[in-house]
Design a protein with these regions (language model features):
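Bacterial N-terminal signal peptides
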Residues: 24-35
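Active-site His/acidic residue clusters
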Residues: 191-199, 273-283, 287, 310-345, ...
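Secreted, luminal/periplasmic, and some membrane-associated catalytic domains
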Residues: 76, 93, 102, 124-155, ...
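Active-site regions of oxyanion-processing enzymes, predominantly non-cytosolic
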Residues: 56, 171-172, 177-184, 190-193, ...
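Substrate-binding rim/cap in mid-to-C-terminal beta-strand-loop elements of soluble/periplasmic
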Residues: 384, 388, 392-437, 514-560, ...
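Active-site-proximal N-terminal segment of extracellular/periplasmic enzymes that hydrolyze or transfer
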Residues: 43-89
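Long, low-complexity, polar/charged, intrinsically disordered or flexibly structured peripheral segments
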Residues: 236-296, 300-301
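Short, structured active-site-proximal loop/turn typified by the sulfatase FGly-forming signature C/S-X-P-X-R
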Residues: 69-118, 179-183
Length: 584
């Protein structure tokens, strides 16, 4: 096997002297006979299979904005991000093309190559005005968690994902010989990347175990049951998340206690952060770097017990690390907590790559790493350096407000806004019909009035999107790519740069007064993510041209010689696929 120091240099020792005349003649004769016969033999097929990676590992780091690996580069260890930066292909200018940069949306895009308008995951949840209920992105009442009773809105599966995924296409390409698994600290971070044909496991903040639903299994495999029986979170009970390095070595050493940071139970706002020793311990573990440690441990177990990468065809493993997102939400990207988390994530990646090298071989593994979205700094932090920012609370619409007053004045009713769910306002179409109003007129009026609210930059109605009556400008195109006729809301809101659209009610459900930072906009800080390809035959190079995460799925597909996912709208990255063609 190749070491971490040599993988990516693409050097292969060949004892044959290909420059000698007899060798050249033999090669030409063999090529001529192959062309004349027009047939492939079993050995040809075996040889082709041997050039394919044995394993594809697609890593998603939740909320890893594109600049973060470079920001802390001088502090990184060996074998983690440094391996990707120095021995992989790094696309340094990658941006999502859709407007709602939320977790579920990004994860779906990464594995389908599709925009939300095609894969259908337009938000973390969407509202159905006919039923008056919200639908979670992976909700499926038919499939409850194994070992639990079926409950409304509690079952999960990939049913809502409308496009096939890379893993699905891999399984379809070889009569289901490939195996596909997905692991994450979040359900959506596992279920969506696992696709329809894979198996998904995710961390439960209530039980402290890795769980799955009856969509995947009737009962837990023994190795999963055994691992959960070991009570993996007990090691953190009563312990603390302490700084990995001396405080004076951190860039953000003075950014540890700010009033806008979330303050939750034993976790607190300052180092050392406690995990607690009560009923909330499993929850706190799931919000800190500890969840990435558990995710890595479980992912290694999947590789070992399912023998991924050991068969005759390519297997696929998706791993989504969630801690960066939770830490960013609680403390903000410009915080001591985020810096320490990145250093810990770097160690996690180094451990993972080393394990892959020992078990499958990095020369046999295609590694892909990206993120589901970026993130802004906290508004209060941006205000401290002179930017005009603020927070716009969606719950504002539950109270008398300028928008409801404008509706009352224009249409004689103030009950025309039914609900909100980021980034949408949902209108009360029953009330609109009762009043004899034209829905498109009300939609466009609400959009026009919403722009007058402080912190709102753009608002587009669904009627504008359906009719195609909008300016062909970047923000409008991003909103259009996010629009799905059956799932998108009545009006799509876009906040001013560095303003937040949020809901204090949603934060309250987590026992928090609020969150430090919230993503979900079409602005660059939210769309900007890294894209790395490494291992196998991938060369070391840095690419500065603008690309999109929609390009990842078709690149992997081309690399493996399989068809693109059904909803794909991206293009293969030639810097990666060309190197693969040359080595073949």
């Amino acid at each position: 096997m190749y070491s971490l120091e040599t993988i990516g240099q693409n050097k292969r020792h060949n004892p044959a002297d290909l420059s000698s005349p007899p060798t050249v003649l033999l090669l030409l004769l063999s090529l001529f006979m192959a062309i004349v016969s027009g047939k492939s033999t079993a050995s040809d097929t075996d040889q082709l299979a041997s050039t394919m990676p044995k394993l594809v590992v697609q890593i998603t780091v939740d909320q890893l904005r594109g600049d973060l690996p470079m920001r802390f580069r001088e502090r990184l260890g060996e074998g983690g991000f440094r391996y990707l930066l120095e021995q992989g292909t790094h696309f340094n200018n990658a941006h999502y093309r859709h407007a709602n940069t939320e977790t579920a949306v990004g994860h779906a895009t990464l594995v389908t190559g599709a925009d939300p308008s095609r894969h259908g995951i337009v938000a973390n949840e969407w509202f159905d005005p006919q039923t008056g209920e919200s639908t979670y992105n992976t909700e499926d009442d038919r499939h409850h968690l194994i070992g639990e009773k079926a409950k409304t809105h509690q079952g999960v599966s990939p049913r809502n994902l409308l496009s096939s995924t890379i893993g699905d296409e891999l399984v379809l390409s070889n009569a289901a010989k490939s195996r596909v698994f997905s692991v994450s600290g979040k359900d959506r971070g596992a279920i969506l990347p696992g696709g329809h044909a894979g198996k998904a496991f995710w961390y439960s903040k209530s039980s402290g175990q890795f769980v799955t639903s009856t969509y995947y299994y009737d009962e837990y495999p023994k190795w999963v049951a055994d691992w959960n029986a070991g009570k993996p979170t007990e090691r953190y009970r009563g312990q603390q998340w302490k700084l990995l390095q001396p405080r004076e070595t951190y860039f953000a050493r003075d950014l540890d206690d700010r009033e806008y940071e979330a303050d939750f139970g034993a976790l607190g706002r300052t180092f050392p952060h406690g995990y607690g020793d009560d009923k909330y311990t499993n929850l706190v573990v799931g919000l800190t770097p500890a969840i990435d440690e558990l995710t890595l441990e479980f992912a290694k177990l999947v590789l070992e017990k399912e023998k991924l990468g050991a068969g005759a065809v390519t297997d696929f493993l998706a791993v989504s690390f969630s801690a960066t997102d939770y830490v960013g939400h609680l403390f903000g990207p410009a915080s001591l907590e985020t810096e320490d988390n990145i250093l810990r994530l770097d160690r996690i990646l180094a451990s993972f790559f080393s394990f892959l090298d020992e078990t499958v071989g990095l020369e046999n593994t295609l590694i892909v790493l990206s993120a589901d979205h970026g993130a802004p700094e906290a508004p209060e932090y941006m205000q401290s350096i002179g930017l005009d920012t603020g927070r716009f609370d969606f719950d504002h619409f539950k109270q008398p407000n300028p928008l409801s007053a404008a509706l009352l004045e224009r249409f004689g009713r103030n009950d025309l806004i039914l609900a909100h769910s980021h980034p949408y306002l949902h209108l009360n179409y029953i009330a609109i019909r009762e009043a004899g109003l034209e829905p498109s007129v009300v939609e466009r009026f609400v959009a026009a009035e919403a722009i007058k609210l402080p912190g709102i930059a753009y608002a587009m109605s669904r009627s504008e999107l359906v009719d195609g009556q909008y300016a062909d400008a970047p923000i409008q195109r991003q909103i259009r790519r996010n629009f799905h006729f059956d799932r998108s809301g009545s009006v799509h809101l876009v906040q001013e740069q560095y303003w937040f659209l949020h809901s204090t009610d949603e934060a309250a459900k987590m026992g928090l007064a609020g969150l430090a930072a919230i993503h979900g906009s079409p602005w660059v800080y939210d769309t900007y993510v890294p894209i790395f390809f490494a291992g196998h035959t991938v060369p070391a190079q840095k690419i500065d041209r603008r690309v999109s995460p929609t390009d990842i799925a078709p690149t992997i597909s081309d690399y493996l010689g399989i068809k693109y996912p059904s909803g794909n709208s991206g293009n293969p990255l030639s810097e990666v696929t060309r190197a693969r063609t040359i080595t073949q």
